[in-house]
């Protein structure tokens, strides 16, 4: 893991950066027992001579009318029930174990969303989090970070009463609409990540570099995935047949190696400035962190406007000054 982290620090290889951000997300509290924030307050005991008092009626939380409370609950991953009697808990898991659980939960919610199934917090605990429930807030935060920065999605708590979550698009609609993948959001995010890596590299991206990024997301070339199926077939055949990618052998190299390039359809439907904005949004950086690519995107944007001034282009949030 340390070797990958070292490679990801290079800004020219920025498409591999989510791993470092995920492993060291600021503000993530590790091993904080839920009882520290979730236990219900206890009434003070009555003295031996105190007059009996009627217990106050329970007050229902007014979460439906308080958006801040909903947002805080989504970010904190509030547990569904207060813990029972305090018992000695297990030793805190290693950060790598929490990252692994976050990846498992990420694919779990993607599959649920793809099948139009409701994403319940109790189901997430039962099916994925399991014995790591004590650290569910950290796992949920890591999962939300990966979803936002890789797939352009937010994991949002939609009902505090039922603990129901939903995936919400985080990218601009005009950016996503230009990539015609039949509204298959996970595949759109995967394609944008590969196209971004190719663009940052300058000319093309070796297949080994692409798989280094996909391994960070828990994808393996030899292992079928619950969301993508055969991942290697998807990126080397399906995306190629749709003309989003080119997949070519590197000449004069033994043993044989392959590299990816932008396909003709990607060049028609996605501008370089959109890729720069995607990278800026994903990695929380200024586009000028990639100076040569940023200048190239500006030149393309000017050329497109000069060639067809009346054409409509998605509004850019990146300054050309």
Swiss-Prot record:
Region (Disordered): 1-96
Alphabetized PROSITE patterns for the sequence: MAGE
Compartment(s) where it occurs, according to its Swiss-Prot or TrEMBL record: Perikaryon; Nucleus
GO BP term, pick one: negative regulation of transcription by RNA polymerase II
Entry's Gene Ontology molecular function annotations: DNA binding; gamma-tubulin binding; promoter-specific chromatin binding
Keyword Nucleus: yes
MAGE domain: residues covered: 98-297
Record's GO cellular component terms: cell projection; centrosome; cytosol; nucleoplasm; nucleus; perikaryon; protein-containing complex
Pfam families: MAGE
Tissue-wise expression: Almost ubiquitous. Detected in fetal brain, lung, liver and kidney; in adult heart, brain, placenta, lung, liver, skeletal muscle, kidney, pancreas, spleen, thymus, prostate, testis, ovary, small intestine and colon. Not detected in peripheral blood leukocytes. In brain, restricted to post-mitotic neurons.
Skewed-composition ranges (Low complexity): 20-35
Xref: Gene3D superfamilies: MAGE homology domain, winged helix WH1 motif, MAGE homology domain, winged helix WH2 motif
Additional remarks: Located in the Prader-Willi syndrome (PWS) chromosome region. Prader-Willi syndrome is a contiguous gene syndrome resulting from deletion of the paternal copies of the imprinted SNRPN gene, the necdin gene, and possibly other genes within the chromosome region 15q11-q13.
Role according to the record: Growth suppressor that facilitates the entry of the cell into cell cycle arrest. Functionally similar to the retinoblastoma protein it binds to and represses the activity of cell-cycle-promoting proteins such as SV40 large T antigen, adenovirus E1A, and the transcription factor E2F. Necdin also interacts with p53 and works in an additive manner to inhibit cell growth. Also functions as a transcription factor and directly binds to specific guanosine-rich DNA sequences.
UniProt-recorded name of the protein: Necdin
Native species: Homo sapiens
Phylogenetic lineage: Eukaryota, Metazoa, Chordata, Craniata, Vertebrata
Gene name of this polypeptide: NDN
């Amino acid at each position: 893991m340390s070797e990958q982290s070292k490679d990801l620090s290079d800004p020219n290889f920025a498409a591999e950066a989510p791993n470092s951000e995920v492993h060291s997300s600021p503000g993530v509290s590790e091993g904080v027992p839920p009882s520290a924030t979730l236990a219900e307050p206890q009434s003070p005991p009555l003295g031996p001579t105190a007059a009996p008092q009627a217990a106050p009626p329970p007050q229902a939380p007014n979460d439906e009318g308080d958006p801040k409370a909903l947002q805080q609950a989504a970010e904190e991953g509030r547990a569904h029930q207060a813990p029972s009697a305090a018992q000695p808990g297990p030793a805190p898991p290693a950060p790598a174990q929490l990252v692994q659980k976050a990846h498992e939960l990420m694919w779990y919610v993607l599959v649920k969303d793809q099948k139009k199934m409701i994403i319940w917090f109790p189901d997430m605990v039962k099916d994925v989090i399991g014995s790591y429930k004590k650290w569910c807030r950290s796992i949920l935060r890591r999962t939300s970070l990966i979803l936002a920065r890789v797939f352009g999605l937010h994991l949002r708590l939609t009902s505090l009463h039922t603990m129901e979550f939903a995936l919400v698009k985080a990218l601009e609609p005009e950016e996503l609409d230009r990539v015609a993948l039949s509204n298959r959001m996970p595949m759109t995010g995967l394609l944008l990540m590969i196209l971004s890596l190719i663009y940052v590299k300058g000319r093309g991206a070796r297949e080994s570099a692409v798989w280094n990024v996909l391994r960070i997301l828990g994808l393996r070339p030899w292992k079928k995935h619950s969301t993508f199926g055969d991942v290697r077939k998807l990126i080397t055949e399906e995306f190629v047949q749709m003309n989003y990618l080119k997949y070519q052998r590197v000449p004069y190299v033994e043993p044989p190696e392959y590299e990816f390039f932008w396909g003709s359809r990607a060049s028609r439907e996605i501008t370089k400035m959109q890729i720069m904005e995607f990278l800026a949004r994903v990695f929380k950086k200024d586009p000028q962190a990639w100076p040569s690519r940023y200048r190239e995107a500006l030149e393309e944007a000017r050329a497109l406007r000069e060639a067809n001034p009346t054409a409509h282009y998605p509004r850019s949030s990146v300054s050309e000054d």
